[in-house]
């Protein structure tokens, strides 16, 4: 395996695209830190799948839109693996509603999870990666950033960057 000894963090790794990315990275030799916000059971299932295939993974709960959680996540990665080689910013939520009916707290939740989290995790990862002068950061987006969907103004505005 070409990436033995390298570590990747995947946010939102307990299901969907994040799960698929985590499995792919593990199959290529990365030790994978599986971040999840709510479903420990789903994250543990991904960890088990990776380990059953001979890979290395650990789960770490945290809301990546909260700086204290991000600090804890990165301290844990440094302790467990010594550093980080790849960050995949995949965590995301939606709170669909027509703009004129959207509650401000739903707007704010999407902005925090889908945008602020990228700032916080990228800042922490870049600090680790700059020390070793190597690393990769991948931000997952959506076609909704190009075409938009009814009821997803908050989600779509984050993706066209």
Predicted stretch roles:
Residues 160-161:
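Conserved small/polar residues in nucleotide/adenosyl-binding loops
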Residues 7, 14-16:
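Conserved glycine-rich cofactor-binding loop
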Residues 142:
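Residue(s) in the substrate-gating loop at a strand-loop-helix junction
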Residues 28-45:
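Conserved glycine-rich Rossmann-like NAD(P)H-binding loop of the short-chain dehydrogenase/reductase
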Residues 98-99, 106-111:
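Substrate-binding pocket helix/loop in short-chain dehydrogenase/reductase
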Residues 40, 61-73, 104:
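The beta1-alpha1 cofactor-binding region of Rossmann-like NAD(H)/NADP(H)-dependent oxidoreductases
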Residues 122-123:
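A short, exposed helix-loop element centered on a Lys and neighboring polar residues
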